């Protein structure tokens, strides 16, 4: 929940640990930001729905349940036709156990793969509802069913920027007058064995003997990202709706932005998308460097991506303090953006900005003021959270204390 998450960030707690979700001994990198002791049965209803929920979907469902409780929203007291859900999701990988028998039946005597045998085996071996576990839109669908949210429902799958774009869409839905209240969320688990094998480990930190310090955004000695998992959900409402029900308002969204930096396939983004997104959201929010409290950075902990982001941040907001929560919990894909935005909401509400773990040696290629060692206080209670992807998309959300 929000309180545990917030105190863990303020205390600089480490969320990186050896992977024990499955047997990871065959992997080169065997650590990540795994959610410990997660029991979906505490949240998912009806229980039979678990059969058609991947771990990503379970996280999203649980986060929505916690968000509703935190916001004091009872779904039966909300107009269901003006209550919607928008979620940012990753591609959801299939479980190997589900496909093993089908795959073995598709192998011929000489060891080659037969698509004819595969198509025959799949009809006999796979459960009819198997696909529902792996459709990204099912997170928003399950949540809407459980919460009786019959209003606008959408899913955005655009890599690391997915969940901030979900916030942007949810805000737009309310501004267009289509809904009074929206659940905007993001979920992802990059610790799935199929995902780990498919993505490879070229961009990952190899600090297996010191995994607690592996994720070190913007630090000179960073050597790669750390995979993680998680989800977060914000309850977004029109002010009129929130005040009418006597809500505790944690913060207010000032503006959102989305930009894209076209690039050649062989090149990583140079940071122009981040720069454009920051300039756009600053202008729309009416903020400047004099009244901007902090930047919540994407902060992957990879060499070129961190440098590109840091230089873009410095070009737009100069020495505005920066925090990078992935240092605590790793990279949760589409879940990260909402987790980071939630951290900034709690920061502007409290007036305290959490530090970045493992930032020890400044990198000249990252000319930004990284908050580290201890939380920072006394800053304006405004913030911008920014995400960007290796394909060049960038998104940003500006918020303020109410």
What are the roles of these predicted feature ranges?
Residues 4-6, 10-147, 151-153, 188-196, ...:
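Conserved beta-ketoacyl condensing-enzyme motif
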Residues 21, 77-87, 154-158, 179-187, ...:
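Beta-strand segments within the central parallel beta-sheet cores of soluble alpha/beta enzyme folds
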Residues 60-73, 136-147, 153-188, 226-247, ...:
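Active-site-proximal alpha-helical scaffold in enzymes
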Residues 107-126, 168, 172, 176, ...:
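Glycine-/small-residue-rich "gating" segment that lines the acyl/pantetheine channel
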């Amino acid at each position: 929940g929000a309180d545990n998450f917030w105190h863990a960030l303020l205390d600089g707690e480490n969320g990186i640990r050896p992977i024990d979700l499955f047997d990871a001994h065959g992997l080169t990198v065997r650590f990540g930001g795994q959610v410990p002791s997660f029991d979906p049965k505490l949240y998912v209803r009806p229980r039979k729905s678990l059969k058609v929920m991947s771990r990503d979907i379970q996280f999203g469902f649980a986060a929505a349940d916690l968000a509703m409780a935190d916001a004091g929203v009872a779904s039966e007291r909300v107009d269901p036709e003006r209550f919607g859900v928008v979620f940012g999701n990753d591609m959801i990988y299939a479980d190997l156990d589900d496909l093993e028998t089908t795959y073995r039946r598709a192998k011929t005597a000489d060891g080659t793969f037969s698509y004819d045998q595969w198509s025959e085996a799949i009809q006999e071996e796979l459960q009819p509802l198997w696909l529902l576990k792996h459709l990204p839109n099912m997170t928003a669908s399950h949540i809407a069913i459980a919460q009786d949210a019959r209003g606008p429902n959408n899913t955005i799958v655009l890599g690391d920027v997915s969940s901030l774009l979900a916030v942007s869409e949810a805000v737009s839905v309310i501004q267009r007058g289509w809904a009074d209240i929206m659940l905007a969320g993001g979920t992802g688990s990059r610790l799935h064995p199929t995902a780990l094998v498919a993505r490879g480990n070229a961009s990952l930190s190899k600090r297996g003997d010191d995994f607690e310090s592996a994720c070190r955004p913007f630090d000179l000695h960073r050597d790669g990202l750390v995979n993680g998992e998680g989800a977060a959900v914000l309850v977004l409402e029109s002010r009129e709706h929130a005040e009418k029900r006597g809500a505790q308002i944690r913060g207010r969204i000032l503006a959102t932005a989305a930009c894209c930096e076209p690039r050649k396939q062989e090149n990583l983004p140079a940071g122009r998308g981040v720069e454009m997104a920051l300039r756009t959201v600053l202008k729309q929010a009416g903020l400047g460097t004099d009244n901007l409290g902090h930047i919540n950075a994407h902060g992957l902990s990879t060499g070129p991506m961190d440098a590109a982001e840091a230089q873009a941040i410095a070009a737009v907001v100069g020495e505005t303090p920066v925090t990078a929560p992935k240092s605590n919990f790793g990279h949760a894909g589409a879940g990260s953006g909402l987790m980071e935005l939630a951290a900034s909401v709690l920061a502007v509400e409290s007036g305290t900005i959490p530090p970045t773990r493992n930032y020890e040696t400044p990198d000249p290629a990252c000319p930004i003021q990284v908050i580290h060692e201890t939380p920072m206080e006394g800053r304006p209670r405004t913030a911008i959270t920014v995400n960007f992807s290796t394909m060049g998309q960038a998104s940003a959300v500006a918020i303020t204390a109410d």
